[in-house]
Regions:
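N-terminal basic, low-complexity leaders that serve as flexible interaction/assembly modules and, when applicable
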Residues: 1-90, 132, 180
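Active-site-proximal, glycine-rich beta->alpha crossover segments in alpha/beta enzymes
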Residues: 83-188
Length: 189
């Protein structure tokens, strides 16, 4: 059955649901950003991780430059970490943001979400940056291109607030503490 021309968003959605498409869908559910693309388009890290305009411009290049059917403006996995009390280093232009301080790493630390949660989460400047970049992309593409977001689950968030090594070791050494972490972080929007 022949399918007529589709918008990138229609193509992505059809491919995702197993429906016929007008051509194979070219998409990535993760970031496609690399140094060559940053040089070509202009925005670089760290600005593209901390400022919604450069973030959106760099994300848009997945479609505008490379022809992908989707764009995704969140380039790393640490955006939520700051909202959960981590100190994240966004300064290295050659690397993705990295948590430098994990509030639950100390074995005596109380495993609980930050004061004011969930409102404080949505007001965090890096969470807002990501949401603003998505809004900018929506204005730029309208309903033509699939705009993807990224949400980390409790396991990945635990790496940030707990410390990766300690968290993984505690899956055996202190599984109750791991469960408390996963339970607390399951409330993150």
């Amino acid at each position: 059955m022949a399918v007529g021309p589709m918008t990138p968003k229609e193509r992505f959605t059809a491919a995702l649901t197993g429906q016929p498409v007008d051509r194979p869908c070219a998409a990535s559910i993760t970031s496609v950003v690399n140094f060559e693309l940053m040089d070509l388009v202009g925005p670089h890290f760290p600005e593209a991780n901390t400022d919604p305009e450069p973030m959106a411009e760099l994300a848009a290049s997945a479609h505008d430059v490379m022809g992908f059917d989707s764009v995704m403006p969140i380039f790393g996995i640490a955006q939520e970490a700051t909202a959960l009390g981590c100190v994240v280093d966004f300064s290295d232009p050659g690397n993705l943001p990295t948590p430098q301080y994990a509030p639950w790493a100390d074995r005596e630390a109380e495993i609980r979400l930050p004061e004011g949660f969930p409102d404080s989460f949505l007001e965090d400047k890096y969470v807002k940056c990501s949401l603003d970049a998505i809004r900018i992309l929506k204005e730029h593409f309208g309903n033509e291109v699939m705009i993807l977001g990224k949400v980390m689950g409790p396991w990945t968030l635990s790496y940030h607030v707990y410390n990766v090594q300690e968290f993984l070791m505690d899956t055996l050494a202190d599984p109750d503490r791991v469960r408390r972490s996963l339970d607390a972080l399951s409330e993150v929007p």
